[in-house]
């Protein structure tokens, strides 16, 4: 409503912001990034909500065959075989799809016994993963895709890629890396506080999210340059790596230390010093 009313608080750089759906925003951002990598294959890794023609078609139209999609398949998605190219010419246009193979869940049950073990670098270490791969036709994207069924003890997931050159290991590793992005969103929204912004101005909202992303990036750069690996404050079984909150605690502790005060000028003491110290302790 505010955008349609062309309110002053909906202006960015003096221009009124036009309404865009999530898919339209995603397409625009990917195209902006792709302009810096001309002639290079681009793989978009996303969840099943974005893994459809609403994202893929406009990207292919704008960027061509250099862009590929890697996403998760829904269990009820129907898959088809690759159409056979016959030597005999029949009237009408050639078939785009072969025979119906079944739903993703039906094929998972059929392929479970034929799964192979792959050595995949996943979540910080090499793991053995049982998976099965097959190239099929996907009607939602209207193109051939490589589907990888990953089988766990009691569950399974199906991942697909429009880039048929990718190996099974690469498809699993790329999709597994997506969860690092999910944790990054959590850090920016909850730990940094982006979701708690009280701004009502479009430009202020953009500035706030940019500063939040910058703050999270600086914290991780700081953590990568530490000589010793930080100790995890909240122990979790099976996890040895440190968390984002551990880095925040180290930075807050360092900012309140005598060494930090020795570097900073303490001659001009501000009346808000105690308040700033309280904020730093809260951050830690």
List where the protein language model places each region.
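Single, function-defining residue in the core of a domain
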Residues: 1-284
